[in-house]
Amino acid sequence: AAAEEPTAAAGTPQVVEPRVHRREVKRPDIDTENFEAGAFVGTISIEDFGSSVVYGGRLAYHFTEDVFAEATVGTSKAGRTSYEDLSGSVELLTDSERRFTYYDLAVGWNALPGEAFFGGDRAMPSSLYLTLGAGSTDFAGDDHFTVAVGAGYRLLVTDWLATHLGVRDHMFDSDLLGENKLTHNLQFTLGMTAFF
Protein backbone atom coordinates (compact mmCIF):
# COMPACT_ATOMS: atom_id res chain seq x y z
CA ALA A 1 0.00 0.00 0.00
CA ALA A 2 2.91 2.33 0.77
CA ALA A 3 4.35 1.77 -2.70
CA GLU A 4 1.14 3.01 -4.33
CA GLU A 5 1.19 6.47 -2.65
CA PRO A 6 2.98 9.08 -4.79
CA THR A 7 5.50 11.24 -2.97
CA ALA A 8 7.39 14.38 -3.86
CA ALA A 9 10.65 12.48 -3.30
CA ALA A 10 9.68 9.97 -5.96
CA GLY A 11 9.38 12.80 -8.51
CA THR A 12 5.60 13.08 -8.59
CA PRO A 13 4.41 16.63 -7.74
CA GLN A 14 1.76 16.90 -5.07
CA VAL A 15 -1.42 18.69 -6.09
CA VAL A 16 -2.58 21.31 -3.62
CA GLU A 17 -6.30 21.81 -3.64
CA PRO A 18 -7.27 25.29 -2.36
CA ARG A 19 -10.08 25.54 0.10
CA VAL A 20 -12.59 27.85 -1.56
CA HIS A 21 -15.43 29.12 0.56
CA ARG A 22 -18.33 30.36 -1.52
CA ARG A 23 -19.55 33.69 -0.25
CA GLU A 24 -23.26 34.47 -0.04
CA VAL A 25 -23.96 37.65 -2.00
CA LYS A 26 -27.22 39.34 -1.16
CA ARG A 27 -28.51 41.58 -3.91
CA PRO A 28 -30.27 44.78 -2.87
CA ASP A 29 -33.98 44.24 -2.42
CA ILE A 30 -35.14 47.02 -4.73
CA ASP A 31 -38.83 46.93 -5.44
CA THR A 32 -39.54 45.79 -8.98
CA GLU A 33 -42.36 48.29 -9.38
CA ASN A 34 -41.61 51.23 -11.67
CA PHE A 35 -43.78 53.97 -10.15
CA GLU A 36 -42.51 56.20 -7.36
CA ALA A 37 -44.63 58.78 -5.52
CA GLY A 38 -44.05 60.97 -2.51
CA ALA A 39 -43.90 64.39 -0.90
CA PHE A 40 -41.22 66.93 -0.09
CA VAL A 41 -40.64 70.03 2.01
CA GLY A 42 -37.85 72.56 1.92
CA THR A 43 -36.99 76.15 1.14
CA ILE A 44 -37.14 78.15 -2.07
CA SER A 45 -35.43 81.45 -2.77
CA ILE A 46 -37.85 83.40 -4.96
CA GLU A 47 -35.78 86.02 -6.76
CA ASP A 48 -36.34 89.52 -5.32
CA PHE A 49 -38.77 88.11 -2.72
CA GLY A 50 -36.51 86.26 -0.29
CA SER A 51 -36.69 82.66 0.93
CA SER A 52 -39.87 80.84 1.90
CA VAL A 53 -41.00 77.35 2.84
CA VAL A 54 -41.94 75.18 -0.14
CA TYR A 55 -43.79 71.87 -0.14
CA GLY A 56 -45.24 69.60 -2.77
CA GLY A 57 -45.37 66.17 -4.34
CA ARG A 58 -43.75 64.15 -7.07
CA LEU A 59 -44.72 61.17 -9.22
CA ALA A 60 -42.05 59.35 -11.21
CA TYR A 61 -41.95 56.46 -13.67
CA HIS A 62 -38.69 54.54 -14.10
CA PHE A 63 -38.23 53.39 -17.71
CA THR A 64 -34.90 51.68 -16.96
CA GLU A 65 -32.43 51.58 -14.08
CA ASP A 66 -30.91 54.80 -15.41
CA VAL A 67 -33.72 56.86 -16.96
CA PHE A 68 -36.95 58.10 -15.43
CA ALA A 69 -39.60 60.77 -15.93
CA GLU A 70 -41.21 62.72 -13.12
CA ALA A 71 -44.05 65.17 -12.64
CA THR A 72 -43.69 67.64 -9.79
CA VAL A 73 -45.97 70.19 -8.19
CA GLY A 74 -44.91 72.61 -5.48
CA THR A 75 -46.20 75.71 -3.75
CA SER A 76 -44.85 78.50 -1.60
CA LYS A 77 -45.70 82.07 -0.60
CA ALA A 78 -43.38 84.90 -1.57
CA GLY A 79 -42.23 87.39 1.02
CA ARG A 80 -41.69 91.11 0.56
CA THR A 81 -39.17 92.76 -1.72
CA SER A 82 -36.54 95.12 -0.35
CA TYR A 83 -38.37 97.96 -2.16
CA GLU A 84 -41.56 97.16 -0.23
CA ASP A 85 -39.66 97.05 3.05
CA LEU A 86 -37.94 100.39 2.43
CA SER A 87 -41.00 102.24 1.16
CA GLY A 88 -43.18 101.19 4.06
CA SER A 89 -46.77 101.02 2.84
CA VAL A 90 -46.23 100.05 -0.81
CA GLU A 91 -47.55 96.59 -1.72
CA LEU A 92 -46.46 95.29 -5.13
CA LEU A 93 -48.60 92.16 -4.85
CA THR A 94 -51.77 91.10 -3.10
CA ASP A 95 -51.75 88.08 -0.79
CA SER A 96 -53.19 85.83 -3.49
CA GLU A 97 -50.62 87.06 -6.04
CA ARG A 98 -47.79 86.15 -3.65
CA ARG A 99 -48.70 82.48 -3.98
CA PHE A 100 -45.91 80.78 -5.97
CA THR A 101 -47.10 77.50 -7.51
CA TYR A 102 -45.28 75.47 -10.13
CA TYR A 103 -45.95 72.36 -12.20
CA ASP A 104 -43.28 70.66 -14.25
CA LEU A 105 -42.49 67.49 -16.14
CA ALA A 106 -38.85 66.39 -16.22
CA VAL A 107 -36.60 63.65 -17.51
CA GLY A 108 -34.10 62.26 -15.02
CA TRP A 109 -30.86 60.32 -15.32
CA ASN A 110 -29.28 58.28 -12.53
CA ALA A 111 -25.73 59.51 -13.15
CA LEU A 112 -23.96 57.84 -10.22
CA PRO A 113 -25.72 54.75 -8.87
CA GLY A 114 -24.05 53.05 -5.93
CA GLU A 115 -24.39 52.18 -2.27
CA ALA A 116 -24.15 54.11 0.97
CA PHE A 117 -22.53 52.22 3.84
CA PHE A 118 -23.63 52.57 7.46
CA GLY A 119 -21.49 50.66 9.93
CA GLY A 120 -19.63 47.51 9.00
CA ASP A 121 -22.37 45.47 7.35
CA ARG A 122 -25.20 47.86 6.48
CA ALA A 123 -25.38 49.08 2.88
CA MET A 124 -28.24 50.90 1.17
CA PRO A 125 -28.63 51.41 -2.58
CA SER A 126 -28.30 55.06 -3.57
CA SER A 127 -28.08 57.23 -6.64
CA LEU A 128 -27.05 60.74 -7.59
CA TYR A 129 -29.39 61.90 -10.36
CA LEU A 130 -29.83 64.87 -12.69
CA THR A 131 -33.12 66.28 -14.00
CA LEU A 132 -34.13 68.61 -16.82
CA GLY A 133 -37.70 69.66 -17.40
CA ALA A 134 -40.21 72.35 -18.25
CA GLY A 135 -43.55 73.49 -16.98
CA SER A 136 -45.50 76.45 -15.70
CA THR A 137 -45.22 78.74 -12.69
CA ASP A 138 -48.21 80.71 -11.42
CA PHE A 139 -46.89 83.83 -9.69
CA ALA A 140 -47.84 87.51 -9.43
CA GLY A 141 -51.06 86.96 -11.35
CA ASP A 142 -49.33 85.46 -14.41
CA ASP A 143 -48.44 82.03 -15.72
CA HIS A 144 -44.78 81.80 -16.69
CA PHE A 145 -43.22 79.16 -18.93
CA THR A 146 -40.54 77.63 -16.69
CA VAL A 147 -37.41 75.57 -17.29
CA ALA A 148 -36.34 73.49 -14.30
CA VAL A 149 -32.81 72.10 -13.88
CA GLY A 150 -31.92 70.04 -10.85
CA ALA A 151 -29.96 67.33 -9.10
CA GLY A 152 -30.78 64.97 -6.28
CA TYR A 153 -29.59 62.14 -4.10
CA ARG A 154 -31.87 59.12 -3.58
CA LEU A 155 -31.27 56.65 -0.73
CA LEU A 156 -33.34 53.46 -0.59
CA VAL A 157 -34.12 52.86 3.08
CA THR A 158 -36.10 49.68 2.34
CA ASP A 159 -37.09 47.87 -0.84
CA TRP A 160 -40.03 50.27 -1.30
CA LEU A 161 -39.17 53.45 0.65
CA ALA A 162 -36.65 56.11 -0.40
CA THR A 163 -35.45 59.47 0.90
CA HIS A 164 -34.46 62.31 -1.41
CA LEU A 165 -32.26 65.36 -1.03
CA GLY A 166 -32.80 67.69 -3.95
CA VAL A 167 -31.85 71.02 -5.43
CA ARG A 168 -33.65 72.61 -8.37
CA ASP A 169 -33.60 75.95 -10.17
CA HIS A 170 -36.91 77.16 -11.62
CA MET A 171 -36.11 79.72 -14.33
CA PHE A 172 -38.58 82.01 -16.08
CA ASP A 173 -38.74 85.51 -17.58
CA SER A 174 -40.38 88.21 -15.48
CA ASP A 175 -40.91 91.97 -15.84
CA LEU A 176 -42.56 92.42 -12.45
CA LEU A 177 -40.06 95.03 -11.23
CA GLY A 178 -40.01 97.10 -14.43
CA GLU A 179 -37.45 95.28 -16.56
CA ASN A 180 -37.69 91.94 -18.30
CA LYS A 181 -35.15 89.49 -16.89
CA LEU A 182 -34.54 85.80 -16.40
CA THR A 183 -35.27 84.95 -12.77
CA HIS A 184 -33.64 82.07 -10.89
CA ASN A 185 -35.66 80.52 -8.08
CA LEU A 186 -33.44 78.04 -6.27
CA GLN A 187 -35.06 75.30 -4.22
CA PHE A 188 -33.62 72.85 -1.64
CA THR A 189 -35.84 69.99 -0.46
CA LEU A 190 -35.97 66.82 1.63
CA GLY A 191 -38.55 64.23 0.66
CA MET A 192 -39.82 60.68 1.03
CA THR A 193 -41.14 58.49 -1.78
CA ALA A 194 -42.62 55.02 -2.07
CA PHE A 195 -42.35 52.56 -4.96
CA PHE A 196 -45.52 50.85 -6.14
Residues covered by each model-derived region:
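Transmembrane beta-barrel strands of outer-membrane/channel proteins
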Residues: 39-43, 55, 71-75, 109, ...
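Outer-membrane beta-barrel "beta-signal"
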Residues: 103-110, 184-196
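Residues that define the transmembrane beta-barrel architecture of outer-membrane proteins
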Residues: 33-35, 51-55, 99-103, 126, ...
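Short glycine/proline- and aromatic-enriched beta-strand/turn motifs that initiate or cap beta-hairpins
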Residues: 2-60
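Gram-negative (and chloroplast) outer-membrane scaffold detector with strong preference
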Residues: 67-140, 144
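Extracellular loop and loop/strand-boundary signature of outer-membrane beta-barrel proteins
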Residues: 25, 43-44, 89-95, 135-138, ...
